[in-house]
Amino acid sequence: MAEVTVKSLAAEIQTSVERLVQQLADAGINKSPDDSVSPQEREALLAHLNREHGGSSDKLTLQRKTRSTLSVPGTGGKSKSVQIEVRKKRTYVKSDAAAQQAEAEALAKREAEEQVKREAEEQTQRDMAELAKREAAEQAKRQQEEQAKREAAEKAKREAAEKEKVTNQHIDEKTKAAQAEKAKREAEAAELKRKAEEEARRKLEEDARKVAEEARRMAEANEGKWTENASEEDNSDYHVTTSHHAREAEDENDRQVEGDRRARGRGGKAAKQKKGSKLSESKADREEARAVNRGGKGGKRKPSSLQQGFTKPAQAVNRDVVIGETITVAELANKMAVKGSQVIKAMMKMGAMATINQVIDQETAQLVAEDMGHKVILRRENELEEAVLSDRDTGAAAEPRAPVVTIMGHVDHGKTSLLDYIRSTKVAAGEAGGITQHIGAYHVQTDNGMITFLDTPGHAAFTAMRARGAQATDIVVLVVAADDGVMPQTIEAVQHAKAAGVPLVVAVNKIDKPEADPDRVKNELSQYGVMPEEWGGEAQFVHVSAKAGTGIDELLDAILLQAEVLELKAVRNGMASGVVIESFLDKGRGPVATVLVREGTLNKGDIVLCGFEYGRVRAMRDELGREITEAGPSIPVEILGMSGVPAAGDEATVVRDEKKAREVALYRQGKFREVKLARQQKAKLENMFSNMVEGEVSELNIVLKADVQGSVEAIADSLRKLSTDEVKVKIVGSGVGGITETDATLAAASNAILLGFNVRADASARRVVEAENLDLRYYSVIYDLIDEVKQAMSGMLAPEYKQEIIGLAEVRDVFKSPKFGAIAGCMVTEGVVKRHSPIRVLRENVVIYEGELESLRRFKDDVNEVRNGMECGIGVKNYNDVRPGDVIEVFETIEVKRTID
């Protein structure tokens, strides 16, 4: 064996000598370029390189491209070249050494097989190329001969007949020789191709037999040790043909194309006639072959990713549908995986019409989903709210607290005067019109303990205020005037107290008046379930006089006695909670809320969550306007610092985190809006007809501003109750605080009148009012406001017309006039007859005609009127059937002004 030097080894492995010397040095072998390298050193170098550069990959992918050019004859004798590219790809997975050796041997066998096949294909392509060249030469020769033939034919016409015969014979001989030569060449080409195909087939069969035998032996020796991974073929192109079946399909397709080409060459006109059918057949063949190629190995290839993979479900799928408090129809349809039209159809069957974007409530959505066969899961969306409200310090021991007493009764029965005497102040004189229009909250220190009083309005408009007062109280003091007795608001106060489950203490006021009758009050109240203690009931009756101060101490004792029976207790230490008694917007201080603390201690700086609003308590004041820093149970306070004006009656709760309080307030606002939209089902079937029947109804638009929230509610409710079938009151805007430019602009846009109750318009609002000529009115007493709105509504009512008889004339005779026709000679028996007045003709007290008096004369003179007891001639317009004895009734139509009752 010849020695292998470093230089020869570098040339053999195709690398530079310097790099090989460096690699040998890295492997611990110091050599110069001329030194010899032993086999052991070569193995050490190979092991070093394997360690440095890592072993071979577990996967081996072979990609081959074979390009060839095929010359195909085209139309007009021209040949065109077609580029053919065959792409092949195969992936192998490395197993152990034996598997690698077997794989290498199998790969060598396959390469030999492919080499034989390629040689056969190349030989066939060369033969076809030679054949195409010969055919092209023959085609050119035939064209030349045809040209010569045409020239000879033209020449033959000019020459003699004997020359034409000689020329034709010569041409026929040449044509026959050319055809014989062509047939001979075609036979030779077919024989060559047949021999090449037989040789290739024989080699393939022999190689396949050898490969099968070798594979059988290797499978027996190394069973289960090597597998070929063909997974990569799934993602390869459709042109990748690696299986034996695919190669056979390609060969068959090539043979068919070649046969079609030859048939076109031989067929002549017949081939042209069958061109369409041949094209369709060859296209079908190509589609079939392409389908075979796509089949891959053993038909296991996956379908194309472009194919539709959806299969229609055999039956409806029942889903778990999660529904919140509100949901749109489109969202519900998506959760059930159905079309929105199906949900709308189901709702219409249930009697509700809805659009696809309409918000529906939880109950409706639950009914629809269950009707369509799905399981409903109701979701509670107020988890954050509950978590915030439950995270409070309320575990301290309860202590006795002062009672909260509400003074209720009919208007002008002396509620505020009674409370005045107790507080020793003059509050009643400060109220406009001498009536209470706000809830006043006061706490009074008596000899026997502290009492918190709430003074509610007695007017009918303040029903909601009285209801809030009854809910926030422990004891109700019902004030009844001894001279008036039980009145409508007295009965209403009894109903509120019973609904809230609050005990009653009856104060019979104005006992010092001569016409006072306390027994009458007891009898009337007993009809409504309020029985005195002396009659076996539970209600305490105390006779008082707010002016003279009679019985005040007895009333306080009765209140404290009732409080002891109730055993009122509250947690004093801890986070406070209470109820909003009243709220308003102060121009200098912002939103102000009067809060009655129920439990805990409200401190300055606490974070308060109140309905839709939240905020930090910036300042606290008592009912006298004094600054305080804390307020315990049963103490009413004014707090500043809320984000907006809370609604009266809202729960005020102290929480820990301002951020969470803001989230809860925003959630409540959103929920309120969604629920409001869900309940506005104007598209329901039962409402459609009522909307159509209403027709044209006059509307009185009003923008209302008041000083406190309770007054806004009371006035708005009273105004809405004034609506009739012909005129409706529509409050387009309402709020707490002064009249601003925005309010004036809204009134101008909606053609509304501006009403201010105990508030005034600012300078910018007044400018808009003057520019737009708006109707702006101020009020301080609710009676005046309601009366003027009634007058405005009366002006919008359609007028009524009344017919009033002004005169009667008896027909004595009838004569003719060439100008007016029949003229009735009459005697005025009653009233006055006026010209151009409407009349009725009565015959035997039955109206037979109604028209107009056209002509009125007395002694040939036209007159405007004829009085009682005088004769006249009357011409009735467009009526000539007047007879003696008829009565002509003259009347006027007068307008009667209507009012709102």
Curated annotation (Swiss-Prot):
Annotated spans, Disordered: 48-313
Top-rank taxon, per record: Bacteria
Entry's family note: Belongs to the TRAFAC class translation factor GTPase superfamily. Classic translation factor GTPase family. IF-2 subfamily.
Entry GO terms, CC: cytosol
Binding-site positions, GTP: 409-416, 455-459, 509-512
tr-type G domain segment(s): 400-569
Entry-linked PANTHER family: TR-TYPE G DOMAIN-CONTAINING PROTEIN (PTHR43381:SF5), TRANSLATION INITIATION FACTOR IF-2-RELATED (PTHR43381)
UniProt source species: Edwardsiella ictaluri (strain 93-146)
The protein, known as: Translation initiation factor IF-2
Pfam families: EF-G_D2 (PF22042), GTP_EFTU (PF00009), GTP_EFTU_D2 (PF03144), IF-2 (PF11987), IF2_assoc (PF08364), IF2_N (PF04760)
Gene this protein is translated from: infB
Role, per record: One of the essential components for the initiation of protein synthesis. Protects formylmethionyl-tRNA from spontaneous hydrolysis and promotes its binding to the 30S ribosomal subunits. Also involved in the hydrolysis of GTP during the formation of the 70S ribosomal complex.
Transmembrane stretches, start-end: none
Polar residues bias: start-end ranges: 68-82
Segments of skewed composition (Basic and acidic residues): 106-226, 278-291
Chain positions covered by the region annotation G3: 455-458
Region described as G5: spans on this chain: 545-547
Source species taxonomy: Bacteria, Pseudomonadati, Pseudomonadota, Gammaproteobacteria, Enterobacterales
Main location: cytoplasm
